[in-house]
Design a protein with these regions (language model features):
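Sec/Tat signal peptide C-region and signal peptidase I cleavage site
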Residues: 18-26
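Glycine-rich, pocket-lining loop/helix-strand segments that form or immediately flank
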Residues: 107-139
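Gly/Pro-enriched, hydrophobic low-complexity segments
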Residues: 28, 33, 103, 113-115, ...
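Bacterial N-terminal signal peptides
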Residues: 7-17
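Positively charged n-region of N-terminal signal peptides that target proteins for export
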Residues: 1-5
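A mature extracytoplasmic/lumenal domain signature
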Residues: 52-56, 77, 87-91, 99-101, ...
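Short, mixed charged/polar active-site loops
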Residues: 63-68, 92-94, 110-112, 175-177, ...
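N-terminal mature ectodomain segment of secretory-pathway/periplasmic proteins
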Residues: 29-104
């Protein structure tokens, strides 16, 4: 299940003096505003480039593992998400994600690992794709119970945090909650957090984001040496 971190990356307060009824109305109004921004951005979104920081927290030993690099996202058609992560620190690796297929290239050992998650985890993969860049509010609400978190600033950019609880029992058992920070300016997620049972979580933050309409397919493809060593860990 660790591989699902790659596809995911791999996402204010209501005044206590208000009555519960008016507070619910205000929260709903703010959530609808987030949905509106997402729905306006979704049909126009074709791709982006950004710097990425991915943090994986293991609570039992209070340990954080941080990967730093860049990401390129390409969406040639709805629900067709292609991504390339190029991590430079602390260990160099490049991750290509296309649908349910994942490739991880380790240049130090000249090894690429191939994973096909579609056969055994098709439903989970489809859920994760709905968390991807350029999703609309209907995609999210079909698969998640969505509530308002509140306004926050991520990398100097104003955003609104929303919380998502999976409707699928299988996904809920593995990842009980997700959080997305949706840019108030672009309607695109600038931070994503994925919780696991207990207090472990994975957090991906995107900065220096450029929304681009014409990402070439070559920009989301691994450029592998001819003599690369190929492994299939799931076989």
């Amino acid at each position: 299940m660790r591989l699902f971190h790659l596809t995911f990356v791999l996402c204010g307060t209501v005044a206590l003096a208000w009555s519960p009824h008016s507070g619910a109305q205000a929260a709903d109004s703010s959530l609808q505003a987030v949905f509106k921004r997402m729905d306006e951005a979704s049909p126009k979104f074709k791709g982006l480039k950004a710097d990425v920081k991915k943090l994986a927290h293991v609570d039992v030993i209070n340990d954080d593992t941080v990967d730093i690099g860049t990401i390129v996202v390409r969406v040639p058609k709805p629900h067709d998400l292609q991504m390339l992560f190029d991590f430079k620190q602390p260990d160099q690796k490049t991750v290509q994600i296309e649908g349910a297929k994942v490739q991880i290239y380790y240049p130090k050992t000249n090894t690429v690992q191939d994973y096909d998650l579609g056969k055994n985890h098709k439903a989970q993969v489809e859920q994760f794709l709905k968390l991807g860049f350029g999703s609309n509010s209907r995609d999210l609400q079909d698969s998640f119970a969505v509530t308002l978190g509140g306004p926050e600033t991520i990398g100097g950019e104003s955003a609104t945090r929303i919380e998502l609880i999976p409707k699928s029992k299988d996904l809920l058992a593995t990842f009980p909650k997700f959080e997305l920070w949706i840019s108030d300016k672009t309607g695109i997620s600038v931070q994503q957090k994925m919780y696991q049972p207990g207090k472990d979580y994975s957090l991906a933050t995107y900065t220096n984001m450029q929304i681009l309409p014409n990402i070439p397919e070559s920009a989301v493809k691994l450029n592998l040496p001819k003599n690369v060593n190929r492994e299939h860990p799931l076989k």
